[in-house]
Amino acid sequence: MTDVLAVIREMSSSFTPSEAKIAKYILENPTVVTELSVNELANACDTSEASIIRFCRTIGLKGFQELKIKIAVSLAKQTRKLDGGITSEDDVMAVIQKIANFNKQAIDSTIAVLNAEELTKAAEALANANKIDFYGVAASGVVAYDAMLKFSRINIPCTAYQDTHLQLTSAVNLKKGDVAFGISYSGATKEIVEAIQTAKEAGATTISLTKYGQSPLAKAADINLFVSSEEAMFRAGAMASRIAQLTVIDILFILVAQKKYNDVVRYLENTSEVLSMRKINN
């Protein structure tokens, strides 16, 4: 079941001013909202009942009653969060606990917003691709490289591009049967959006991996995969979002491996054997 509070959080940047006001109140007062009528919530948000209903439909719900039920479910499933981000006073154990907690929350929230149908479509496209180009910069570039390492081990032709000029020169030469996979947590990285648009115009199937919501990258791609994470103020290399993205790549890798199971077993045995020769024996 989708975590409606996570959905509202991730869609916040795409809401209209009226919707943003409703979202802010819900996120700040989720327990209170479960006890309000639609009229009471409208008054609390200084808006109309019709606006509340439109908001519900914007986030994929049928109406206000469903919103209240899903908020109650989200609250029931919430685990206690460690208070605040990392501070200069935190000892080693506090840092260990907080990082583990941030990453766990990112994975749990991502599982809540992942769409099985879109995952299936993405896995099908990747399994049948003539070649795959992964595009990402900075922390998302690390995820693109990880994806290339995984899929190359099962004999799927793929390349990870972090250089923005190479992304464009790759994208423009793709064709039908190829896949371009753009990775950007914000979904607004100009170079990644341009590369995906270029690949799509060239005839390739395009996939995006970005935070939940209608970002420029999500609008440009054929297939959208979403992650969810709340980054702490003190962060190193977009930690939580990177973990969420890597989790989706792992899921896709297994889904593709299932589709090519007999071949994959042989490929993994081959790669394991050849790499074992590079290890130093004690």
Swiss-Prot record:
<dbReference type="InterPro" id="IPR047640">
    <property type="entry name" value="RpiR-like"/>
</dbReference>
<dbReference type="GO" id="GO:0003677">
    <property type="term" value="F:DNA binding"/>
</dbReference>
<dbReference type="GO" id="GO:0003700">
    <property type="term" value="F:DNA-binding transcription factor activity"/>
</dbReference>
<dbReference type="GO" id="GO:1901135">
    <property type="term" value="P:carbohydrate derivative metabolic process"/>
</dbReference>
<feature type="domain" description="HTH rpiR-type">
    <location>
        <begin position="2"/>
        <end position="78"/>
    </location>
</feature>
<dbReference type="InterPro" id="IPR009057">
    <property type="entry name" value="Homeodomain-like_sf"/>
</dbReference>
<dbReference type="InterPro" id="IPR035472">
    <property type="entry name" value="RpiR-like_SIS"/>
</dbReference>
<dbReference type="GO" id="GO:0097367">
    <property type="term" value="F:carbohydrate derivative binding"/>
</dbReference>
<dbReference type="Pfam" id="PF01418">
    <property type="entry name" value="HTH_6"/>
</dbReference>
<dbReference type="InterPro" id="IPR036388">
    <property type="entry name" value="WH-like_DNA-bd_sf"/>
</dbReference>
<keyword id="KW-0805">Transcription regulation</keyword>
<dbReference type="InterPro" id="IPR000281">
    <property type="entry name" value="HTH_RpiR"/>
</dbReference>
<dbReference type="Pfam" id="PF01380">
    <property type="entry name" value="SIS"/>
</dbReference>
<dbReference type="InterPro" id="IPR046348">
    <property type="entry name" value="SIS_dom_sf"/>
</dbReference>
<keyword id="KW-0804">Transcription</keyword>
<feature type="DNA-binding region" description="H-T-H motif">
    <location>
        <begin position="38"/>
        <end position="57"/>
    </location>
</feature>
<feature type="domain" description="SIS">
    <location>
        <begin position="122"/>
        <end position="262"/>
    </location>
</feature>
<protein>
    <recommendedName>
        <fullName>Uncharacterized HTH-type transcriptional regulator TTE0211</fullName>
    </recommendedName>
</protein>
<dbReference type="InterPro" id="IPR001347">
    <property type="entry name" value="SIS_dom"/>
</dbReference>
<keyword id="KW-0238">DNA-binding</keyword>
